[in-house]
Every structure is written in structure tokens, then in C-alpha cells.
Amino acid sequence: MDYDKKNLLAIRILPPNNPGIPHEANRKEGIGPNGGALCLDGPTFISSEGWDWIPGIRDRNMGIWQDVRVKFGNELEIVDTHVITDLPLPDTTSVNFIVQTEIYNSSKTTRTANLHFNIGGVSAVYPVSLNANEKKMIKLTSNECKELQMKNPRLWWPNGYGGQYLYDASLSLISSGKDTLDVKKMRIGIRELEYELSAYEDNPPIVRLNYNPTAALQDGKPAFDTVKRKKTDNKVRYTNYDGEFVPYLLKPVSSQGIELIKDSLMKEYMVIKVNGQRIFCKGGNWGMDDGMKRVSRERLEPALKLHKNMNYNMIRNWTGESTEEVFYELCDEYGMLVMNDFWLSTDGFNLNPLDNCLFVRNVTETVRRFRNHPSIALWCARNEGFATNELEYMLAATLAKEDGSRHYTGNSRSLNSSGSGPWRYQFDAGWYYRSLAGGFRSEVGTPSLPTAETVREFMAEEDTWPISDVWYYHDWHNHRYGSKTFSELYKEGMDRKLGPSDNLDDFCRKAQLINYESHRAIFEAWNSKMWNDASGELLWMSH
């Protein structure tokens, strides 16, 4: 770095080693595979090779899609701060703060300073001293700093359960000469997560637990072992492919943060709780925030407003495709809990990453970057399946160490969950009530055609009618159910209920009625069984 002249910052962008070859969907050859070789390079935007909901993105979203910042600092630096809010539940009239941060001394001599934490009128000071080139982890609780307490805090709640109050907080290093050496600014939502779920021990049968990670994970060790999972005998409803499982409990029942409870109605299914209150999760999956990674606040905020106005309270970040700070900021502001996947998809179909260590380093960086967001409620290893045993153990250890405030689950649909799907149109909407509704379901949906105005945004007018290969390129579904494809079932149902269409506008108008009927039935079916084993339902897809 030359401080007296202009400096040039060069950024080299490398293509993925395994970009794969997208399948060009058409009527004759069908929808093609979901993803492909790009999964080997994980973590990547695996859907950009093409999926059954998105054509291939030609450059696989290579390049820079967020701001790049160059920071000039002093010899003492604050690194990777984590603030945990600990409520003495069920009491919410006070909160204790747990502040963890690394501090790095890049100088060649010992340095001292005072570490200041400020939030909502609370101010705590702690002296630090670091040797030359030392990086030190500092963890402060109310035991070390009695000031790390607040009375009558304003809480953060999911949409529909209360407000989304966010405190401005800062962590500063102040020298003996009162100079500010470094400062980290954050927005903190005061809330505490708990989970009701089932697990098993060596001898007793499956047990039902109330699990509080903030209490249970302060030793930095996992509470559950997903590799030693047990399959449950639950044949109550349609379940997708791989069955239903519960994890092995690594810590004794009634140890800190793990409490035995009695609840036969919820079976083994997960219930998410915020501030001691059960949250009935309603929302949808985001496959990608934007296909071309145009991810400004101006582009994303209307989607979050829509979710809030639809009374949703959860977004699933499917395979971690939404990667920017503003996504989580908006989820904080609009009260959307986030089920955050990592970059793995369907076990037995999608390829596993070639480099587990690279994958876990990216997990570590992702968790450290976003863990202060109150909206994140759940970390998840894989969409539709389990990670390999080696990678699963690495992930579980990493999450317990890096984020002792949230649950980590090893599977999006089969672990303390009731499966995923189906994704086909149901002519008889009552089927959702009779045969499907219940549990915590990470995906369920139906083909869903947008308005004619939207169709004309991505098709030339001459291609909009009749249905042609241009429709199939844009994923007019060719998945089969029995002798018919998803798109045939959808169109047939529309024709039977509302009559055949002979132009795009009429077809899309009728589609909105069919879409409304289907999605209303899905949500009402889950609502009808709330806490009578139903705890959450996420549409495929809501964005």
C-alpha cells in the first residue's frame, strides 16, 4: 500500500471448476435433472445450473454481487462479534447479554485497551491486553460485567406475534488516550429461541424435549447426533421418500437447557418457540433472491412487505441461495423467521461437494457474518437428505461452537419433520385435510401460473399462446405423476372446473382462481390441526 500515490485493487474472478451443462427443458425431452456437476464445487449457487423452477444461468452467477469494502484500521481490531440475548424465561422483564468477540493485535508489542459494549442505555466496560500478534477470544457475561443486564427490554417477535424492535448496539475498543481504535456496529433484536422436539437415548424410548440452545450449548458441544438417528414408526400421512427420523440425544435429560415435557399430540415434530411462545410457522421457500443477483434493498423490500402482508412469519432460504446482508436485515425488520439451509441438495440425487473442509470454512464464515440477526431461527445442513457422516459431524461441531443460540438440524424434511411435497395439483382440495396436513413441513405446493402481464415480461408475444416449448423452457412442468405430467394435471383441473381457454389472458385469469383455491386449502388444512401435531408449513415457493 502506497499512501502517497493511487493504488490499484485487482480482483480475479475464476469460473467454477465444474460448471455443468444445463438441460434445455422442452416438451419432448422433459424437465431434465435438478442441478448437476456444479454441486461438486459447493458451496455454489447450485440452482444456477438449472432446476425444475429456473432455467440455467449462463455464467452461474459468477462475479461480485455485493459491495466490496476495504477497511483501514489500527493495530487492535475487533473480529467476528457475537451478541446473545438471554432471557430468564418464562420471565421476559429482564435480559442478560452474552458478548463474544475476537480481538487481534497486529503490532509487534503488547497492547491494552478498554472494550466498551453499548445497547439501549446499557454500557459495559472490560479491560483487555494482548501480546504481539495475538488473537484472543473474549467472552463477557453478567458474571464478569454486572452491567450486561437490561430491565424491561423491548422484545423482537415474529410477524403476527408482536413488534420487531431492533436496538442499535456497538462494541468499541478505546485506548488509554480515549482514541477509538475500532468499532463494530450492530442491530440487535432481543429474543430467545427454544424448540420442542423428540430425540432418543440409549435405553429409554423416544422422549419429548424442550430444548434451549442458549443454555445447552454454552460448552460449545452439540446436543444431538444426527448420524445416530432413529427411524420412527409413523404411517399417519403421506411422507416423501426417505421416512421420518429423530436424532440421538448427546446430553442427559434435565441437563442445562434440556427439559423433559409431556406432549403426545405433537408426536416427534419440531415446534419453534420465541420468547417462550409457540410460533405456528407459515411461509414459503425462496429458491434465489434474484436470478441475476440484483439484490439491492429497493428490489428485495417489496417481496418482504408482501410476505408480511400475507401474514407469513417464516422464509426458508433454500440451499442458502440468498447470501446478502440486506436479505437478513429485511427479515429482521419484517418479522420473518429464517430457516437457513447450507448448500447441499437431495441426498442420493445431487452430488456431494468434493472438499468438505472448504465447505465447512464457508459455513463458519456464513454463521459468523449473520448470527447476530434475530430472524435466523434454524440452521439446516441439507435440502431433502442428510450430509455424509463425515461432513455431518463437522457441521454439528462447527454450529455448536460458532452459534450457541440456535438449533441446527441435519435434514430439511425428515428430521423432526413430516416430509416435503407433494408439488402437483390436487383436484380435490379436501385431500390436504384428510391425508397430508400435520407436522412441520418444509415444502408443499402446486404448479402456479403467474398473471398474463408477468408471462409477457419473459416471453415474446408470439410465444405466449398456445403453450409451446418456450413454456417448457421456463419450467412448464413435465414431472410425471402416474400417466400424466404435473402441467397436464394442472391444466386438466382448470379446464374441468372453469372451462377450456383459447388465449393467454383467459388461461392466466382462471389460473389465479385455481392457485387461490389450492393455496388456501393448504394453509387452512394446517391451521385446522394447529398443535394437534401441526406446527408449520412452508410453500414451495413464495418468491
Residue map of PLM features:
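Secreted/periplasmic carbohydrate-active enzymes, especially glycoside hydrolases
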Residues: 1-290, 294-314, 518, 528-534
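The substrate-binding groove and active-site-proximal loops of carbohydrate-active enzymes
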Residues: 51-57, 157-158, 256-257, 285-298, ...
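Active-site region of glycoside hydrolase catalytic domains
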Residues: 79, 83, 97-98, 105, ...
